A protein has these predicted regions:
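Conserved small/polar residues in nucleotide/adenosyl-binding loops
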Residues: 1-3, 134-140
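Active-site-facing substrate-recognition patch
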Residues: 4, 9-35
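Generic enzyme active-site microenvironment
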Residues: 5, 46, 95-99
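Short, structured coil segments at secondary-structure junctions
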Residues: 17-19, 62, 117
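Short, glycine/charge-rich flexible loops or terminal/linker lids adjacent to PRPP-binding catalytic cores
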Residues: 23-27, 31-33, 37, 49-93, ...
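Active-site glycine- and acidic-residue-rich loops that bind
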Residues: 45-52, 127-131
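Thr-Gly-centered strand-to-loop micro-motif
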Residues: 95-97, 102, 124-126
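Helical hairpin unit composed of two closely spaced alpha helices linked by a short loop
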Residues: 110-133
Length: 144
């Protein structure tokens, strides 16, 4: 028997199991979907530094630019500062994340990108945890 999972939050999680773990990547599903959207001026974004390798991999698959958000937290889910590394002016941005908890990081990143001149922002996430998303401002961010 083998355990299969998609986009583990950290590769080290594989070592927590006594059984073998197949770490599968959601890019095998998301990349063809993104290509089917035929988006012009595409840029791939990570909402935090931890997802930069993932965003870079997607950007290579999709022949797109990549931008990354740098965030600072004071505690827990409280973001005190966020900066964008890269240019999104006139771009259609796909924000890739592995896990959504409160969606605070995603919404702050999407709002920042719109403020910096992005035409649109779409968020694509592997794992959405069952919490309330009632605070989302949904023309700003679309969760796929």
């Amino acid at each position: 028997m083998c355990i299969r999972d998609r986009d583990l939050h950290a590769d080290q999680i594989q070592g927590f199991f006594e059984k073998p773990v197949d770490h599968l990547y959601a890019s095998s599903i998301f990349v063809p979907y993104i290509k089917s959207l035929n988006i012009n001026n595409l840029t791939i974004a990570s909402p935090d530094m931890g997802g930069s390798k993932r965003a870079y991999a997607y950007s290579k698959f999709l022949d797109a630019d990549v931008v990354i958000c740098y965030k600072q937290r004071s505690k827990g889910n409280v973001i005190t500062h966020m900066e964008l590394i890269g240019d999104v002016t006139g771009k259609n941005v796909i924000l890739i994340d592995d896990m959504v908890d409160t969606a605070g990081t995603l919404t702050k990143a999407a709002d920042l990108m719109i403020d910096k001149g992005a035409e649109s922002v779409i968020a694509i996430c592997t794992h959405a945890l069952p919490v309330s998303y009632t605070h989302l401002t949904l023309p700003t961010i679309l969760l796929v």
